[in-house]
Structures are given as structure tokens and as C-alpha cells.
Amino acid sequence: MKLTCMMIIAVLFLTAWTFATADDSGNGLENLFSKAHHEMKNPEASKLNKRCLAKGDFCNLITQDCCDGICFIFCP
């Protein structure tokens, strides 16, 4: 009986902790679905379609837009 109560309390605590420490606590699922809908309308907005620069191209130190490695004036 004690073990069952402890397990229930642990599960409730971990569930509450997960929701409390989530990255997007405001408008959780509602905001997620609106972003997904926007990306379906405009595939260019998807983060998966991010364009990157080839080896030897000038790159941006702030956005780190190289395909391989870290940008330092030129892509490695």
C-alpha cells in the first residue's frame, strides 16, 4: 500500500515538474499547432528547410550558417 502511494506521488510530481520546466509554458499546444499550420502554408518558414553555406564560402558569425562545423569568416 505504501509503495503504491509513493509511486503515485512520484508520477504526479514528475508530471508537474515536466509541465513547470517546459520551454514554452504559455499557449503550449495552441501555439504549437498554429506554428505547424503556418509551416504547412509556407514551407520556407520551416526550420528544417534552413539553407547552409558550402565549404569555403563567407559565413555569418552570428547565425552560424555553415553546413559543416562552426563559422569563422569562412566555412570549414
Swiss-Prot record:
Which tissues is this chain's protein expressed in? Expressed by the venom duct.
* Cell location: Secreted
The Gene Ontology terms for molecular function here are: ion channel inhibitor activity; toxin activity
Record's keyword terms, sorted: Disulfide bond, Ion channel impairing toxin, Knottin, Secreted, Signal, Toxin
How is this chain modified after translation? Is not hydroxylated.
Tell me the domain of life. Answer: Eukaryota
Principal subcellular localisation of the protein: secreted
Concerning PROSITE patterns, the annotation shows:
OMEGA_CONOTOXIN
Q: List the disulfide bonds.
A: C52-C67, C59-C71, C66-C75
What family does the Swiss-Prot or TrEMBL record give for this protein? Belongs to the conotoxin O1 superfamily.
Role this protein plays = Probable toxin that inhibits ion channels.
| The protein, known as | Conotoxin Am6.3
